[in-house]
Each structure stands twice: as structure tokens, then as C-alpha cells.
């Protein structure tokens, strides 16, 4: 454990941030999984609705640095492509 006051404070901040980030990352994964689940069920309307919820979450967390911006772009691109493929079929 840290002995210096500022180091103790930083340790507390790390714990708080870690818990917050873990919860937010879980929320992100859940949102993406809902889109994938709708896609697997060939539910285009449900997938679009779930994607409308997931997209701003991806943008927000990439802006905050919770995930890399390229990872957010990759998720959005792949999910959009799958939604378009289901609508076309």
C-alpha cells in the first residue's frame, strides 16, 4: 500500500475508475450483443433498433478512450453491413 498521501489518493481514484470502466464496458458489450442477437434471428427491424442504441454508446466510449476509435468504427461498420445484408435478403 502507498505511504504518500497523493499516492493513496491515486490508488483510490484508480479503483473508482476501474469499477466505472468495467460497468461501462459491460454495457457496451451488452448493447452490441443485442444487435448480434437480432441479426442472428433475421430480425431487421429489431437489429436496427438495437443498433440505434449501440451506435451512440460506441461513439461515446471511443471519445472517452474506453475503447479505441478504430474498434468502435469496426463494430459499427460490420454491424451496419450485416443489417444491410439482412434487409437486402
Curated annotation (Swiss-Prot):
Alphabetical GO biological process terms: translation
Database matches in InterPro entries: Ribosomal_bS20, Ribosomal_bS20_sf
One GO CC annotation: cytosol
Family listed: Belongs to the bacterial ribosomal protein bS20 family.
Role this protein plays: Binds directly to 16S ribosomal RNA.
PANTHER family hit by this protein: 30S RIBOSOMAL PROTEIN S20, SMALL RIBOSOMAL SUBUNIT PROTEIN BS20C
Protein's recorded name: Small ribosomal subunit protein bS20
